[in-house]
């Protein structure tokens, strides 16, 4: 097999069909079920987008009401899971807590190996209801704060912000603008074709393993800094720079050292990430309300240097990092926020994989030593 036949990282390999989303790098655009993501961000709730991803069409008023009622009915945590979360060390990464929680939830699945789409979607409902509770609990237990119960009258974004930050005066959970900007990020992070975590979920599903195992594997993939973990590294970089006036110099020196700077470049988009303008709009909106112009100036300076020196443009993680920071989230929890959104896309892909399944099993090109015989241990040197 020649080197030209080996596609490292499956770069450019088309492994299957999907009707869920379409990434179009040539036109710098992304659609969910045919709708431009920027159109969905401006005109739909996160719940409407989840429904679209799962069923292929935007819901009617009655369909959305039923969908929301079903989803909110799952907002309760098993006592054993609560105890498990509190037993985990505060030093572990929050993604480890999520991964452990999903694995625990899977032990209660009465029919783990079913390929029934409705059952898989019910698991999706369960995860979309309970994982925000897990993340909120984890945030508050690490800071010694009391756990806040979910509100069954609120949407996913609003309820989550309430569970994390409470509802006192000044809380972002009481600001319609803050809730909407956070919800926009959930829509933008919800789905993105065959990315590493989604492909991991599909690989696991292709073996006919259970949905919880597929989601657990996807969380493991998303934890990596070359995938979902990048938004955390973006903010750590900004905090390290600290002063916007130092950003250009910091970037220049980092590029001179040929360091990888998270938040820039994309495996598919070569002319810019189509989701960035919508997320940047929310980032600037949050900065205006939360005295965050420092981060906007730093963002602009870093972007300017990177594009001038390399031509590489930002990806979604670059504006999302400071946006989440201005909302008040601890940096280590940025990637779990990604999970809360992407569970919707993962669920849609697991259903699609089961509908027309083929075991995913690529070939490899061997480049080790040629075949040889075993030498008795007494004769080895």
From Swiss-Prot:
<dbReference type="GO" id="GO:0005975">
    <property type="term" value="P:carbohydrate metabolic process"/>
</dbReference>
<feature type="binding site">
    <location>
        <position position="342"/>
    </location>
    <ligand>
        <name>substrate</name>
    </ligand>
</feature>
<dbReference type="InterPro" id="IPR024176">
    <property type="entry name" value="Citrate_synthase_bac-typ"/>
</dbReference>
<dbReference type="InterPro" id="IPR016143">
    <property type="entry name" value="Citrate_synth-like_sm_a-sub"/>
</dbReference>
<comment type="function">
    <text>Catalyzes the Claisen condensation of propionyl-CoA and oxaloacetate (OAA) to yield 2-methylcitrate (2-MC) and CoA. Also catalyzes the condensation of oxaloacetate with propionyl-CoA but with a lower specificity.</text>
</comment>
<feature type="binding site">
    <location>
        <position position="192"/>
    </location>
    <ligand>
        <name>substrate</name>
    </ligand>
</feature>
<dbReference type="InterPro" id="IPR002020">
    <property type="entry name" value="Citrate_synthase"/>
</dbReference>
<protein>
    <recommendedName>
        <fullName>2-methylcitrate synthase 1</fullName>
        <ecNumber>2.3.3.5</ecNumber>
        <ecNumber>2.3.3.16</ecNumber>
    </recommendedName>
</protein>
<dbReference type="GO" id="GO:0005829">
    <property type="term" value="C:cytosol"/>
</dbReference>
<dbReference type="InterPro" id="IPR011278">
    <property type="entry name" value="2-MeCitrate/Citrate_synth_II"/>
</dbReference>
<dbReference type="GO" id="GO:0050440">
    <property type="term" value="F:2-methylcitrate synthase activity"/>
</dbReference>
<dbReference type="InterPro" id="IPR036969">
    <property type="entry name" value="Citrate_synthase_sf"/>
</dbReference>
<dbReference type="InterPro" id="IPR019810">
    <property type="entry name" value="Citrate_synthase_AS"/>
</dbReference>
<dbReference type="Pfam" id="PF00285">
    <property type="entry name" value="Citrate_synt"/>
</dbReference>
<feature type="active site">
    <location>
        <position position="266"/>
    </location>
</feature>
<comment type="pathway">
    <text>Carbohydrate metabolism; tricarboxylic acid cycle.</text>
</comment>
<feature type="binding site">
    <location>
        <begin position="260"/>
        <end position="264"/>
    </location>
    <ligand>
        <name>CoA</name>
    </ligand>
</feature>
<feature type="binding site">
    <location>
        <position position="361"/>
    </location>
    <ligand>
        <name>substrate</name>
    </ligand>
</feature>
<feature type="binding site">
    <location>
        <position position="275"/>
    </location>
    <ligand>
        <name>substrate</name>
    </ligand>
</feature>
<keyword id="KW-0816">Tricarboxylic acid cycle</keyword>
<dbReference type="GO" id="GO:0036440">
    <property type="term" value="F:citrate synthase activity"/>
</dbReference>
<comment type="subunit">
    <text>Homodimer.</text>
</comment>
<feature type="active site">
    <location>
        <position position="317"/>
    </location>
</feature>
<dbReference type="GO" id="GO:0006099">
    <property type="term" value="P:tricarboxylic acid cycle"/>
</dbReference>
<comment type="similarity">
    <text>Belongs to the citrate synthase family.</text>
</comment>
<keyword id="KW-0808">Transferase</keyword>
<feature type="active site">
    <location>
        <position position="227"/>
    </location>
</feature>
<dbReference type="InterPro" id="IPR016142">
    <property type="entry name" value="Citrate_synth-like_lrg_a-sub"/>
</dbReference>
<dbReference type="GO" id="GO:0004108">
    <property type="term" value="F:citrate (Si)-synthase activity"/>
</dbReference>
């Amino acid at each position: 097999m020649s080197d030209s036949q080996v596609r490292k990282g499956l770069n450019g390999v088309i492994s299957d069909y999907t009707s869920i989303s379409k990434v179009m790098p040539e036109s710098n655009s992304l659609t969910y079920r045919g709708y431009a993501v920027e159109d969905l961000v401006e005109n739909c709730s996160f719940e409407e987008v989840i429904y679209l991803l799962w069923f292929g069409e935007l819901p009617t008023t009655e369909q959305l009401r039923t969908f929301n009622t079903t989803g909110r009915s799952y907002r309760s945590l098993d006592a054993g899971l609560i105890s498990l979360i509190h037993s985990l060390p505060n030093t572990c990464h929050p993604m480890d807590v999520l991964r452990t929680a999903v694995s625990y939830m899977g032990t209660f699945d009465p029919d783990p190996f079913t390929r029934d789409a409705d059952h898989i979607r019910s698991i999706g409902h369960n995860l979309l209801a309970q994982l925000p509770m897990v993340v909120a609990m984890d945030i508050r237990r690490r800071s010694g704060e009391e756990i806040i119960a979910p509100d069954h009258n609120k949407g996913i974004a609003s309820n989550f912000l309430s569970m994390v930050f409470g509802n006192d005066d000044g809380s972002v959970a009481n600001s319609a603008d803050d809730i909407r900007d956070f919800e926009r990020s959930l829509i933008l992070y919800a789905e993105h074709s065959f990315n590493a975590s989604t492909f991991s979920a599909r690989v696991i599903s292709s073996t006919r393993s259970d949905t919880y195992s597929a989601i657990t594997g996807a969380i493991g993939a998303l934890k990596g800094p070359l995938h979902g973990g990048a938004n955390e590294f973006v903010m750590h970089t900004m905090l390290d720079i600290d002063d916007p006036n130092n950003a250009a110099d910091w970037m220049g020196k980092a590029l001179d050292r040929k360091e990888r700077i998270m938040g820039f470049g994309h495996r598919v988009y070569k002319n810019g990430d189509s989701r960035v303008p919508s997320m940047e709009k929310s980032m600037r909106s949050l900065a205006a309300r939360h005295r965050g112009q420092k981060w906007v100036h730093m963002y602009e300076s870093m972007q300017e240097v990177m594009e001038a020196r390399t031509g590489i443009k930002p990806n979604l993680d670059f504006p999302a990092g400071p946006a989440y920071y201005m909302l008040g989230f601890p940096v280590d929890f940025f990637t779990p926020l990604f999970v809360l959104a992407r569970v919707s896309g993962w669920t849609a892909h697991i259903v699609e994989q089961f509908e027309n399944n083929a075991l995913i099993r690529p070939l490899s090109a061997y480049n080790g030593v040629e075949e040889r015989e075993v030498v008795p241990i007494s004769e080895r040197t």
